[in-house]
A protein has these predicted regions:
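Outer membrane pore-forming secretion/assembly proteins and partners of Gram-negative envelopes
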Residues: 27-31, 258, 305
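Gram-negative/organellar outer-membrane beta-barrel architecture
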Residues: 1-132, 138-141, 237, 244-249, ...
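Short hydrophobic "helix-edge" motifs at membrane interfaces and signal-peptide entry regions
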Residues: 33, 273-275, 303-304
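Secondary-structure transition/capping motifs at alpha-helix termini
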Residues: 1, 40-45, 75-81, 164, ...
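Glycine-centered small-residue hotspots that permit tight backbone geometry or close packing
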Residues: 232, 238, 303-307, 315
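Strand-loop-strand
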Residues: 291, 296-312
């Protein structure tokens, strides 16, 4: 049984994002899960896992409460290669959504609470010298997922996520390590027809809004919980959590909407100064795209910065300061903040 709980101010979303106002504290984020393991299922070379979970997360664009169960079988094909097959069922409830005004009526009615039933599979090759703080090796992985109404999901989509990381000691400089990585995510929702019941204007008798006749519309959107987001301590560090994007995925007030595609590129030079202290310089680039057809390297946004690592018994304690290299102005006239500070445990990638 594993749990995770975070403590923060009990304020509205703006105070969470910008650290303003309020003095009350509350447990606003938590995750509780329990896992049952069955080695060598039915005498095979596959190991089985069944996990139940409940989680509440606070994101810049919405709050997410999710609960569900996941059944997984994994196989160690070689010492470096692992494969897995999964079936997942869950209920996602999104609240406190910050949406584009034109999207609010549609998204609020279709996806306030959505049931997902998915099949997924993955293949990973890992040759890192140390999974916590690698100095040599590579990681390559491909994940694919499908949700469909025929298997009990309320929405359908297909999604894939690919990533590759490489780590090398600089020849002739054993205290220097170069790390680089690339991530690509693509998702395509299945179009379906749904009936909406819009509210008609106030009637002549002054009885208020009345439900008009249903209209049928074609829907091809992903729920908020299934969209890609980026920005933060493990993606592009010049941006705060989920704040990477442009006009298509960040609204007029700076709130992230997520997208159907993502590109992330990272490069980092790690220098060991003492037995417990490392200094790091990094360059990150990427973007979140509203549609797969919108993916373009010309729309990549970037950030650079530096950081400090303290080698603790639980892993590197990390402090990074990222700078945006292409600040933009929101439609409301506000300019993006120039920097983002991140404090975490473990390497960024």
């Amino acid at each position: 049984l594993f749990t995770r709980v975070s403590l923060r101010r009990k304020n509205d979303l703006d105070n969470l994002l910008f650290g303003e106002g309020g003095r009350d504290l509350g447990f606003n984020e938590y995750r509780v899960l329990g896992t049952y393991q069955e080695p060598r299922v039915l005498g095979s070379t596959w190991n089985g896992f069944v996990t139940g979970f409940v989680e509440q997360a606070i994101r810049p664009g919405f709050d997410l409460f999710t609960r569900g169960i996941n059944a997984q079988v994994t196989q160690q094909v070689t010492p470096q290669v692992t494969t897995s097959l999964d079936y997942g069922w869950g209920q996602n409830n999104t609240t406190n959504k910050q949406l584009n005004r034109e999207d609010e009526p549609l998204v609020d009615r279709l996806f306030p609470e959505v049931r997902l039933s998915t099949f997924s599979g993955s293949v990973a090759r890992d040759t890192r010298s140390d999974p916590v703080d690698p100095r040599d090796g590579e990681v390559l992985s491909v994940d694919a997922e499908i949700a469909a109404r025929t298997i009990g999901s309320e929405v359908g989509f297909i999604k894939t996520f690919m990533q590759a990381f490489v780590y090398r000691v600089v020849p002739g400089a054993p205290r220097l390590v170069v790390a680089a990585g690339a991530r690509v995510g693509l998702a395509r929702p299945f179009v379906r027809s749904v009936e909406l019941f819009p509210l008609a204007p106030v009637d002549s008798a002054g009885l208020g809004d009345v439900v008009a006749s249903p209209i049928e519309v074609e829907i091809g959107e992903l729920p908020l919980s299934e969209r890609f987001f980026a920005g933060g301590d493990t993606t592009v560090r010049g941006f705060a959590l989920d704040r990477l994007g442009d006009d298509a995925t960040i609204d007029q007030d700076g709130f992230p909407q997520g997208g159907n595609a993502i590109l992330i590129f990272n490069a980092e030079l790690r220098a060991r100064v003492t037995r417990t202290i490392d200094l790091v310089g990094f360059f990150d680039a990427g973007n979140v795209y509203d549609r797969i057809r919108s993916v373009s390297l010309a729309r990549i946004r970037s950030g650079a910065g530096f950081g400090v690592r303290y080698r603790s018994p639980v892993g590197p304690i990390r402090v990074d300061l990222g700078f945006k290299l292409d600040r933009q102005t929101f439609d409301n006239g506000d300019l993006e903040r120039p920097t983002a500070l991140h404090i975490s445990i473990g390497q960024a990638f």
